[in-house]
């Protein structure tokens, strides 16, 4: 009996991936999408100027690859977004995905603050310290984190990591930590995170792992291929990178708002927002 139940459960998981491909937009969908065009000012291109501002460089490959040669994150897979919005897509989501498609290394504040975007659903932010880099969030996987760190070392400065900040315990903010440590000449840098970080990461990814995975399947459209009738992106970003990932125990835990720490000459003041983005 158990074997039959498992087979049925497996079928319920697999079958949707075979029937997810969509056909042409219905008349209702076309009318709804056309209505959006009248509600928003699509002639305003300021966001595109903002998204491209400070661009330095990106990788010269069609995808971010893992160490064993597998695709971690496709870059050219979203090239269909270069075209005008089709009838099958909500114009606002299409535009947002076009903005999210910008990828590579960007200068935010000259000689002080840089970001790597579009290699994962999460960004990596690099703060220039006295002797190296302080990194805010390290993406979901080692492949994406390595690509980002390599990019700033190549185009700005090849410096060690002096500190890493995990803003909260969702995997896209800490998963690439091993690649950062491996790529840095300094291995014993500080890792700053909210109080209760490890317990929360365990609760969400182990104890609630099955439910979180199910939610992510809907949330990220994991069974849809990128296309005009499939996955257009997640809104927040295009997609999560795939491949090996890890976690590291924080060396400093933030417990109160206003708490200050100085890392390699950079004083940082933290805001503790319990139970907001995640458990901590």
Predicted feature residues:
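Active-site metal-binding motif and surrounding structural segment of the metallo-beta-lactamase
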Residues: 131-132, 142-192
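N-terminal pre-domain segments of enzymes
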Residues: 22-102
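Conserved beta-strand hairpin/beta-sheet module of binuclear metal-dependent hydrolase folds
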Residues: 98-159, 278-280
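Non-globular, low-confidence helical/coil segments that flank catalytic cores
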Residues: 36, 40, 47, 51-56, ...
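Short, acidic/polar N-cap/turn motifs at the starts of alpha helices
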Residues: 60-62, 103-104, 124, 251, ...
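Bacterial N-terminal signal peptides
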Residues: 9-17
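Metallo-beta-lactamase
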Residues: 107-108, 157, 192, 197-274
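Bacterial N-terminal signal peptides that target proteins for export
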Residues: 1-9
């Amino acid at each position: 009996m158990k074997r039959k139940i498992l087979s049925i459960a497996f079928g319920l998981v697999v079958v949707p991936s075979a029937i997810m491909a969509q056909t042409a937009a219905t008349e209702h969908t076309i009318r709804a999408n056309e209505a959006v065009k009248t509600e928003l000012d699509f002639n305003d291109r300021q966001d595109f100027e903002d998204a491209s501002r400070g661009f330095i460089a990106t990788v010269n490959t069609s995808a971010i690859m893992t160490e064993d040669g597998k695709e971690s994150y496709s870059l050219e897979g979203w090239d269909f977004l270069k075209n005008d919005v089709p009838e099958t897509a909500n114009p606002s989501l299409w535009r947002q995905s076009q903005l999210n498609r910008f990828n590579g290394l960007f200068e935010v504040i000259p000689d002080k603050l840089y970001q790597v975007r579009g290699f994962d659903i999460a960004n990596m932010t690099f703060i220039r310290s006295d002797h190296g880099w302080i990194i805010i969030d390290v993406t979901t996987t080692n492949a994406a984190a390595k690509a980002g760190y390599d990019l700033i070392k190549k185009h700005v400065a090849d410096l060690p990591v002096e500190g890493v900040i995990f803003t909260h315990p969702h995997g896209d903010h800490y998963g690439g930590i091993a690649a950062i440590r491996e790529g840095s000449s300094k291995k014993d840098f500080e890792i700053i995170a909210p109080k209760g970080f490890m317990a929360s990461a365990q609760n969400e990814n182990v104890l609630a792992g099955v439910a979180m995975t199910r939610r992510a399947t809907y949330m990220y459209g994991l069974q849809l291929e990128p296309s005009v009738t499939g996955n257009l992106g997640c809104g927040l970003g295009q997609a999560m990178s795939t491949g090996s990932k890890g976690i590291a125990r924080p060396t400093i835990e933030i417990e109160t708002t206003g708490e200050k720490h100085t890392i390699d000459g950079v004083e940082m003041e933290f805001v503790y927002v319990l139970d907001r983005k995640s458990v901590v």
